[in-house]
Structure formats: C-alpha cells, structure tokens
C-alpha cells in the first residue's frame, strides 16, 4: 500500500519522491491507486493552506490567496489546469467529436482554454479571500477541497470509457470497479467531515459530487468518453465547486 501511495504521488504531482519508494509497481496496477487520490489531495491542500497562513499576516488575504493557489498549481506541475484548458478548447470548439479530441491533444492554448484558466484561477483566489474574511478555516477548507475534488474524479472513471485509443488517462478510466469507487468517495467524505465538522464539509462534498457527475455525463455525451484532460478539468472544477459550496 505504501509503494502504491508513493507511486501515485510521483505520478500525479511534482513533489519529490525517492525513486526506490515508488519503483517496482507494475503500470497495469496503477488503477488501484485511485484510493490514494483523496490522501494525496489532502497533502496538497494542507501545504497550500500552510502557505496561506504563513503569508496572510505579512501580505494580507488577497496575496496570500494568490500564492496559495500558485503553490497548488506548481505542486501538480499545472497538470490539471492544462487538462482544464485543453478540455475547454476542444468542447467549446463546436466541431465534430474527432476534431474536438484532436484540438484537445494540441499543445497550443486556445481562446476558450485561456478564458477557462483565467476564470478558474481568479475564482479560486476570490473565493479563498472571501472564506478568510468570513473567518472560515482556510487550512482545513483547502485540504478538504483538494481531497474531495480528487476523490470525486472517480465518478469520471467508473463505468466510463476512454475516448482515445491510448493515453495516460487510460490507466484509470474504465479500469476501476464499484468497490474502489466507494472506498475513494468514502475516504474523501471522512476527510471532509473531520476537517469541516457540523456536516458543512459533507454537504459541500455532496454538491461537488452532483456537479462532477453532471460534468461527466455532459463530457461523455460530447466526447464519447473521458480522457486525462477531462479528469484534470474535473479536479480543478471540483476544487472550485467545493470552496464555493462552503460560502
């Protein structure tokens, strides 16, 4: 289990992991790592929250929120933000399904992708600032948001098909079973309930689950399935929806 966690941490983040801790795991078994997603999100969110707390006293709430969002993006190498941009470029191109997938594979940033990045990043900064001004615990909120967003991404993997013939997303999409999905969502719910007691966190997770489920169905209808890019988009939007639900 520990090797699986380190392998997933190395796979979906840019945090330094000693190679000997993550080596030796068959790539075909990576799908089992979905259950570690909420824990990895918890770690990323906690680090981002600590950055906010450390900078708030010196720079004020808005700049602390800016740097916490920046650190979160850097820890993932902008991987999920890139997926969000590619997904929006493809889906909003109003082309055929095959052409949408081609556009999503293009490394160049389009207008829709750029607008999506600006909106989501700016929205996160504003929501974090508002939560802080309302006296909400930012460390717990960010940790829970990152855990839940990565946990609910399982909804785009279970009983979904991969829209391409090959790609990194194929490691998870259509490969996880009902038990793994329930365990992943259960862990995310536990983290949300513990970090944000009084059902506040659980209620925000329910809202996030509904939003991600609807997103998954819309993407399935539009693209014929999911890709690694759509998983990244779901994680980014899941974080934002969860934080908005806390307001």
From Swiss-Prot:
UniProt keyword Magnesium present: yes
Catalytic activity, per the record? alpha-ribazole + adenosylcob(III)inamide-GDP = adenosylcob(III)alamin + GMP + H(+); alpha-ribazole 5'-phosphate + adenosylcob(III)inamide-GDP = adenosylcob(III)alamin 5'-phosphate + GMP + H(+)
User: What keywords does the record list, in alphabetical order?
Assistant: Cell inner membrane, Cell membrane, Cobalamin biosynthesis, Magnesium, Membrane, Transferase, Transmembrane, Transmembrane helix
Transmembrane domains' residue ranges: 34-54, 59-79, 113-133, 138-158, 194-214
**Listed cofactors:** Mg(2+)
The protein's GO terms of the molecular function aspect are: adenosylcobinamide-GDP ribazoletransferase activity; cobalamin 5'-phosphate synthase activity
Report the locations given in the UniProt record: Cell inner membrane
Please give, as recorded in its UniProt entry, the membrane topology of this protein: Multi-pass membrane protein
- What is an annotated GO biological process for this record, any one? cobalamin biosynthetic process
Query: Does Zinc-finger show up as a keyword for this record?
Result: no
Q: Name one GO cellular component term.
A: plasma membrane
- Its EC number is 2.7.8.26
Q: What's this protein's function?
A: Joins adenosylcobinamide-GDP and alpha-ribazole to generate adenosylcobalamin (Ado-cobalamin). Also synthesizes adenosylcobalamin 5'-phosphate from adenosylcobinamide-GDP and alpha-ribazole 5'-phosphate.
**Top-rank lineage group of the source organism:** Bacteria
Q: Return the similarity comment.
A: Belongs to the CobS family.
What organism, scientifically named, is this protein from? Escherichia coli O17:K52:H18 (strain UMN026 / ExPEC)
Q: What is its main location?
A: membrane
- Which pathway does it operate in? Cofactor biosynthesis; adenosylcobalamin biosynthesis; adenosylcobalamin from cob(II)yrinate a,c-diamide: step 7/7
Record's protein name: Adenosylcobinamide-GDP ribazoletransferase
């Amino acid at each position: 289990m520990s090797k699986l966690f380190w392998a997933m941490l190395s796979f979906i983040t840019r945090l330094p992991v000693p190679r000997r801790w993550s080596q030796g795991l068959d790539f075909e078994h990576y799908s089992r790592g979905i259950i570690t997603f909420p824990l990895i999100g918890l770690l990323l969110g906690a680090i981002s929250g600590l950055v906010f707390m450390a900078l708030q006293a010196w720079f004020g709430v808005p700049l602390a929120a800016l740097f916490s969002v920046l650190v979160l993006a850097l820890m993932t190498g902008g991987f999920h933000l890139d997926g969000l941009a590619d997904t929006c470029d493809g889906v909003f191109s109003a082309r055929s399904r095959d052409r949408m997938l081609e556009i999503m594979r293009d490394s160049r940033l389009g207008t829709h992708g750029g607008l999506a990045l600006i909106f989501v990043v700016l929205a996160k900064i504003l929501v974090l600032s508002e939560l802080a001004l309302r006296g909400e615990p930012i460390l717990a909120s960010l940790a829970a948001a990152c855990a839940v967003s990565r946990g609910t991404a399982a909804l785009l993997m279970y009983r979904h098909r991969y829209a391409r013939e090959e790609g990194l997303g194929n490691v998870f999409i259509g490969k996880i079973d009902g038990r793994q999905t329930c365990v992943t969502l259960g862990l995310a719910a536990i983290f949300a309930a513990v970090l944000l007691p009084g059902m506040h966190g659980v209620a925000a997770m329910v809202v996030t689950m509904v939003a991600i489920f609807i997103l998954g169905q819309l993407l399935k209808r539009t693209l014929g399935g999911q890709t690694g890019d759509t998983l990244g988009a779901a994680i980014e939007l899941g974080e934002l929806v969860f934080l908005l639900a806390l307001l």
